[in-house]
Structures are given as structure tokens and as C-alpha cells.
Amino acid sequence: MALRPWQLSLLLLALLVAPAAPGEAIEGTVVRVVDGDTIHVKLWERVEKVRYIGVNTPETHHPTRGEEPGGREAAEMNRRLVAGQRVRLELDVRARDRHGRLLAYVWVGDLMVNAELVRLGYAQVMTVPPNVKHQELFVKLQREARDAGRGLWRGG
């Protein structure tokens, strides 16, 4: 029996809002880079706001502090890595934050963007349990970036 269009839409919506199993992956296309650690991804016919797990970049539009130093550079690096790209979103224990954003480790091919931003020095480690799957890697990469003076660690 074939599904009617409304039934298929309902099924896809249920899959998007249901709690995800750790390690589950969803594929989509980046349609907007918001800043250094947030993107919009088209998943089927819906666009989801995705926040990178385990990392934090300086803000480009903070509600009280405005643009933070390095925010524009981090956003530009993120744009270079993901804009228009097909991505794989790897989920961890908690799938959404308190703002309703999907939380993910973002992959372009074999490159984990979260880790690459830390490695290049454009993001710092921000661990929010229970999403800690790649925490040790992020801490190691941050130490290396800081020691090498890369990205936001330059000159100070």
C-alpha cells in the first residue's frame, strides 16, 4: 500500500522531531551559515537550525555584546567549510537544545567541521553533557591550536 503525500510528510516530520539514538546520522544540504557554530540545513522539505556540538565560536550578533572579537573570522571559516555543501549530521545523546536547535557533529565527507574549527583555532571547546562523544579529541585539538598560535590564538 502506497503512502499518501500527507502520510509521508507526517512520517518525515515524526522522524525529525523524535529523540535520536546516539551516533544516528541525518544527511542534508547547508542553505545558510548563521555564524561560526550554527548553520541552517535542508533536511527533506524542512530547514533545521543546527548548532555544532562541543564547540563555541565568538558571536557575530550577540544580543548584549554585539559582535565579539573573532566572530566574523570564525563565521567566514565556517562558510568556507560548509556553505552549499551536502553534510552528514551525527547526533549524540541529546538531539536538541533549549532553543529547539538540532545539536550535531557536522561532517563534510570525512571532515568533522566541529573538530576542524577547533584545529584551526576558530572555535573553543564547550562541553555540555550529555553530548560528550568527541570531547577528548576537541580538547587535544584546542591545545595544539593554542600552542601553535592558530586562528583566534594568534598573538596572545
What are these regions (language model features)?
Residues 2-156:
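Small beta-barrel nucleic-acid-binding modules, primarily SNase/OB-fold domains
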